[in-house]
């Protein structure tokens, strides 16, 4: 693995290896040990979108591993004044050992990977959120003991999270049902890939179908960053897609809930459902740091 731009193209073995490494980093940290596997390494954290969890977990994780993380917002870079992405990539590649980038367009990540000459990791784009779904998979496996054979349901917008849930969950042997309103389908190439899994994948407009007999239910915000002008229309379109107690009752009694946060209580998730599943949702928020450590260790330290 040279980069982590999306989950598509990763083998099940590569995904599970990252989860295994993340488990080990968590075990060691709980024992008071943080291996300095990034000693002498510098990572550029290029963020065109705001972030609480991804930014802070990366900064803390890189520090714990003995490395340096430099946060660069859009206003810190000359790309804001017209410098081509490929030129910024070439410069960062001379200074840093890796780049983690949260941006809007997937093509920006592709350009960074092509021209920087160093590993590039997606911190989220409009197309995919691979670190998040790897973290979800780690959290589900911790609690369920396995991934293969579980049913995953996603209720909400067929956007970046849904794209990565489809690819990641199918790759590790889960059955996936995605429920989204008409006009909010996942990416065409992701749906094409999902077809290869036959009846292990279902796309529906019925959120109850996604919830029925689920082992884990995923959801995400209805209005993602950059969509603020569409907010009212989206809220109307997503009426009936709230993960509420009635919908949870359709799932298995021990069904987990995963939400990437921040959560909009009363929109994509009911307040009582979020609180009932807060432990697993915030376990996932914690686990992000271990997955990020694992990805950087695989890319930079030969783990």
Explain the meaning of each model-derived region.
Residues 1-56, 60:
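Positively charged, low-complexity intrinsically disordered leader regions
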Residues 42-43, 47-95:
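Active-site cofactor/substrate anionic-group-binding motifs, chiefly glycine-
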Residues 48-60, 142-219:
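Glycine-rich phosphate/diphosphate-binding loop of Rossmann-like nucleotide-binding domains
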Residues 97-168, 259:
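Anion-binding alpha/beta catalytic cores of soluble intermediary-metabolism enzymes, centered on
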Residues 109-125, 229-251, 276-278:
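A short, gly/pro- and small-residue-rich
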Residues 195-271:
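Rossmann-like adenosine-cofactor binding region
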Residues 254-255, 260-303:
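Adenosine-phosphate binding glycine-rich loop
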